[in-house]
Amino acid sequence: MIINFKKRGSKNFINLLIFLSVGFAQQSSHQYIEYQRIQNRLQQGWNTWNTSSVLQQVLLPQGFAINLAFKQHYFLEEQYLSSALIGRRGDFTETVRPGPHAYDGSYTQLEIQWEGLDARIETAHAGKDLVILISPNSIPHDRMKVIIESGMLWNRQGHLSRKINQLKAVCPGKIIKVFTTSVPVDDDPYIDVKTPYLAVWLDGEIGISTGKKRTLLEIKKAIEIQKVSLQSEAEKFGELAEAYIAVQAGIAWNLIYEPKFDRVVSTVGRLWNEEYGGFCTFGWDNFFLAYMTGLASRDLAFSNVIEHLRGKTEQGFIPNDNRGNGSKSFDRSQPPVGGIMVKEVYKTYPEDWFLKATFDDLLGWNRWWHRSRNNEGLLSYGSSPANNPFNEPVFETKTAAGYESGMDDSPMYIGVPFNKKKHTLELQDVGLTSLYIADCRALAEMAGILKRKKEQKELES
């Protein structure tokens, strides 16, 4: 249909634009609304959302935090542990041994050792409340305090206060109270805390609860309920139940709320997040994380895929790493497993909107490989000329090409030169080419479902 705008007048033209814009908005908002619902569901309740410490529980969407810190009292020097991370190294650092961790934070358990501290810390949901149990494996020789800190994160609105033996947070639409089974001590004003807190001696088991004051017995019962629930969920995997609990824990301890883009997303490790400005996602790792979370959670699987694809470069490829400080690996990608993993997630949760939301980004990445890494008929890993605003030293080197492979300094690349004219290793990589073919087949299958005949033909040729 041809419309004569001059004949029909500017008013009709404006009305048509409004009609068309509404139509397009409805078409695109179908994906946005569905995905926003996913994020709204994920951003609820207590969990180890803050990447800065595994000893901190945060309530979303309010952003209220309960942080556990420890103060060691020596006769001369005193030490203060305000945060803890898994795998941290160095003198006088904490050692954290992670235990089970449900994706939704309904149960977590870890062991921590530091400067005489040796304890197990468990947390659990009790309805919409949180309970925490600190169980010392031994009483420290030198006296130690547990500091129960309150906090409001990410500039969320709230008012914090302490009244005798409880903490209180007043947030929009919600009041949170925090209690402890131990007797608070106020003999030490020299504590490195800038918000209301409770300090108690670590001379036995310590219980912490929100909502209402609970006894140690009540806290232990709430924890046991969630432990049993986690075990029951794992039993559907049969003889692999314990393996599933371990895999879930490994992923869940690195699941965070990422405030820069207002999202819940899996990361590879909190130490990486700390080093790279708040978060770090990796080219192929995060697609594997999406697949693994999909064994139990549709919402996490979809979120991990969609958020990872949002990190693509202007050239259309998924970078080796994507960092919270704004830096990316602008010169290199990682193995093309995205289409394969997304197809597997779709097989578990066959929702066409999910394919529509991801297909074009995956196709763009697929085309980039053929365009940028074709080395006389087969593919090779490499590192391309690119803007380097953060002055990363490895651009256009063999080292960077190794990073693109995901195998970094593998012995397979000993003696293989880097061709600076081709920007690739002088190695036609059968493994990479095979993954690329598998990616083409996965995307062709997706194109067929979406009735994208032209793209399907391209991918099958």
Regions found by a protein language model. Give the residues of each.
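Hydrophobic alpha-helical membrane context
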Residues: G23-F24, S297, K451-R452
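Terminal accessory carbohydrate-recognition/targeting modules of carbohydrate-active enzymes
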Residues: I2-N4, R8, F13, L17-I18, ...
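Internal, well-ordered alpha-helical segments in soluble enzyme and binding-protein domains
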Residues: T51-V54, T358, W365
